[in-house]
């Protein structure tokens, strides 16, 4: 039986909140089978839980947040959620003593290292996948995103940024998903923003944690970060990272092919909700033995250099 995964032990780190610019303590806790992914704000009394759920997602200008029925929110969940998807963590409690997950370096890599440091524990319950049975597509103007049947999880993402720093040949990225592929090819890709937007937000008391340490920053002509890019196509790789995190908001890995053109958090979430709302478009899948499991989802065997 392919089993659900959680952590072996509690791990903790600190970082800076993108919105507040203040120090945030992040604690990752193991959870029992069928708990799912739970985000928890411990700065509130009593603490407030936010189960990962496609319907709770709100897309703001700066990040993805989860909002409960009382309009309480937890922000900047997308990069950690992508790391959970990357390692196939089914059950976890994510605690922060703030309204937001720390931004770290703007990628998912610090979270991958933290999760690997905790270690992965298999639980004695079958891991449940969402298997796509029919194509589902959503559109917004010229932007679109689609999930279609595929025995694995493949991603094909195209961006269309007219900017001197983003070469036309680096605007499409394709990948057959695996924990190793995610860790090596996607997790290190950072979020990006315009200097003018960051300055405008900070003048209004927003994005106070935004800096060269946690994003690729561009002006109208070039990348301003001293060390440049981590990949020549880091921009599109980060959009794929975002999509992996967005699609994991249902708390289950997807078996299917994801294709997108100029999609973002809002459209990715719209696609996930459209799939889940169309009962004939998907089914639950479990696997009795590894031989029948798509190679994509074999247990991660990561040695991170």
From Swiss-Prot:
Keyword Metal-binding tagged: yes
Broad class of enzyme this protein falls into: hydrolase
Protein keywords: Hydrolase, Lipid A biosynthesis, Lipid biosynthesis, Lipid metabolism, Metal-binding, Zinc
GO cellular component labels: membrane
Pathway: Glycolipid biosynthesis; lipid IV(A) biosynthesis; lipid IV(A) from (3R)-3-hydroxytetradecanoyl-[acyl-carrier-protein] and UDP-N-acetyl-alpha-D-glucosamine: step 2/6
Positions that bind Zn(2+): 79, 238, 242
Gene Ontology annotations of biological process type: lipid A biosynthetic process
GO MF annotations in UniProt: metal ion binding; UDP-3-O-acyl-N-acetylglucosamine deacetylase activity
Protein family according to the UniProt entry: Belongs to the LpxC family.
PANTHER family: UDP-3-O-ACYL-N-ACETYLGLUCOSAMINE DEACETYLASE 1, MITOCHONDRIAL-RELATED
Name listed for the protein in its UniProt record: UDP-3-O-acyl-N-acetylglucosamine deacetylase
